[in-house]
Amino acid sequence: MIKDERWEGVYSFEDSPYLMETLTDLRKIGTENISFRKGLVRLGRYMGYELTKTMEFEKMPIQTPLEKTQGVFAKDRKNVVIITILRAAFPLMEGLIKNFESAKVGIVSASRGHAPDFNIEMNYIKVPQLNPEDTVIVSDPMIATGSTLIHVLREFKDSKPKRMMIVGVLAAPEGINAVKAEFPDVEIFVTKIDEKLNKDGYIVPGLGDAGDRAFGEPFKVSMLPQMHNLE
């Protein structure tokens, strides 16, 4: 895990050959949906493990079958809330939660419009009660403009949890700048920080639309009436 000196509290995993190989597979245009999803799960699991190293723990006395000794209790690991942004973040969350088995989970449905406005639409939020001792992890594969994450974080800023993190696959400097400008204390962990955004608001070189690549291209709204006629 590498601290990026351009920002406070921003980290990447560019020093991990395993994650870089997994990211390479995700970038390839020919990677199938199932392989893409599995790759996101692997990234989430590895990054979740690395996050546990940043959490507080305390020593505690325990009794083994042979004698008394000292054990470790990672108390922060028991107070995790993972907030997942539909839909591409589901595989990432699946990997994360393997490190935080008792985590509570929140779901947010949010989507970003097209250039030049990039308007954000949020139509569903279901999040557990947040407490002062909680570590909140917002999972979103792509930190592009940062506008979606900013809208999500605004919903919870008054809860004042112990820590607020964003875990993603790729980020653009523009997105990190936007998030940090409004939420300077939020910690950001991504597999890699890419070069920039293009005129359409996509990260480049990037990996395309993570949701479509993980789950397939969705039906267009205009096609929904045709679905009813199939019965």
Swiss-Prot record:
Question: Any inhibitors or activators noted?
Answer: Allosterically activated by GTP.
Q: List, alphabetically, the Gene3D superfamilies matched.
A: 3.40.50.2020
What catalytic activity does the UniProt entry give for this protein?
UMP + diphosphate = 5-phospho-alpha-D-ribose 1-diphosphate + uracil
Q: Does the keyword Glycosyltransferase apply?
A: yes
Sites where the protein binds 5-phospho-alpha-D-ribose 1-diphosphate: 87, 112, 140-148, 209
Give the co-factor note.
Answer: Binds 1 Mg(2+) ion per subunit. The magnesium is bound as Mg-PRPP.
Cofactors required: Mg(2+)
Gene Ontology MF: a single term: GTP binding
* EC number from the UniProt entry: 2.4.2.9
Tell me the residue numbers annotated for binding GTP. Answer: 38-42
Looking at its record, which EC class is this enzyme? transferase
Does Nucleotide-binding appear among the keywords? yes
Taken from the record, one Pfam family name reads UPRTase
Pathway this chain belongs to: Pyrimidine metabolism; UMP biosynthesis via salvage pathway; UMP from uracil: step 1/1
Which keywords does this Swiss-Prot/TrEMBL entry list?
Allosteric enzyme, Glycosyltransferase, GTP-binding, Magnesium, Nucleotide-binding, Transferase
Q: Which of this chain's residues are annotated to bind uracil? A: 203, 208-210
UniProt-listed SUPFAM superfamilies: PRTase-like
The processes (GO biological process) annotated in the record are: UMP salvage; uracil salvage
Q: What does this protein do?
A: Catalyzes the conversion of uracil and 5-phospho-alpha-D-ribose 1-diphosphate (PRPP) to UMP and diphosphate.
Under the heading NCBIfam families, the entry gives: PRK00129.1, upp
> Could you say which protein family the record assigns here?
Belongs to the UPRTase family.
Q: What is this protein called?
A: Uracil phosphoribosyltransferase
Per the UniProt entry, what species is this protein from, by scientific name? Methanococcus maripaludis (strain C6 / ATCC BAA-1332)
